[in-house]
Amino acid sequence: MRAGVSRINPNPFTTRPEIEGTFGVVTSTHWIATAVGMATLEKGGNAFDAAVATAFVLQVVEPHLNGPGGDVPVILHDVKRGKPEVICGQGPAPAAATIARFTELGLDIVPGTGLLAACVPGMFDTWMLLLRDYGTMRPSDVLTPAISYARNGHPIVERASATIATVEELFRDHWPTSAAVYLPDGNVPPPGSMFANRTLADTYERIVREAANAGGDRVKQIERARQVWSQGFVAEAIDRFCRTQKVIDVTGAPHGGLLTGADMARWQAHVEAPLTYDYGRYTVCKAGVWSQGPVLLQQLALLRGYDLDGMDPIGPQFIHLQVECAKLAFADREAFYGDPDFVKVPIDTLLSEKYNAERRKLISNKASMDLRPGSLTGFGGAI
């Protein structure tokens, strides 16, 4: 590389230096998590070890965006395997979450908040699977930084503080266990103040301890950590809370949960092939329909029928076409997507040129305000 000439951009004009190097790069949405990821590389970990350590710290420092109760679709490429892969980290709904059960509760839709909305939390098992099959480290190596920041605290970011403020009354009046964590001293933590989550630190510390007590190699310890999460004290606590507690949700009424320890024990994260779409000289990879990610692939299939190269990328025509194609793809999501373990999703048809050529005919120079799914024989399409 010539001195002063960037390999990324040969004619750079930036107010910040471009990130280049020969050792490794870590990026995340929080500087502490990024630093932990880089430290993991410097300790000899590989990219997957760094990703796992970074992810666990993000749960601590950005609790308004993710946490141990969440899900995670992972798209990865391991040079040793030579192909992109997906880890499904989307836990299923509880076995008891049937239409009959919600009808019995007087509900015609699953509440968007509260215990009834809870699925099997897929995050922990997913990161452990990634660590086992692609990483090199033990659970203690990737969890220790998160435990430290959860126990000792970190400067809470403005958006986390603001998000807690929006649910302050709800936590104070109806979610006392959440209030105990997120309203220290009974108040919303101001931006920049030191914020700790010692309950989370205790949880991960116990998992690390029980995994280490299992002895053996790293794989045995990882498997023990997964078991502790899905069949041990974590699953037991979730089961007990959902059975014994009722908390108010978006319906305005208190409800208990349907998630059980048996639901937790039945599910594990798994590796699968991505769904792909060839667009120009690129192959775009997304997780399966369970992630809703293939909506983007259908948007590309719709856009393929237009000469975008000749358009201003910030001009009204370019933006209009992108928005209208997105509307059609999302309408098809509403009509055809579902859990592939229970629903046959016609994804090959939804990504086909024949189908999308017909869908493009709906796009005019006028913005549509209607939800317009397609119609496929044997699959309905009505919403």
Please provide the spans of the model-predicted regions.
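Noncatalytic scaffold domains of N-terminal-nucleophile
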Residues: M1-A35, A39, A47-R224, W229-S291, ...
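Short amphipathic alpha-helical interaction patches enriched in hydrophobic/aromatic residues
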Residues: L41, A211, D307-G310
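Flexible, polar/acidic helix-loop-strand segments at domain edges
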Residues: P294
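Protein kinase glycine-rich loop
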Residues: Q298
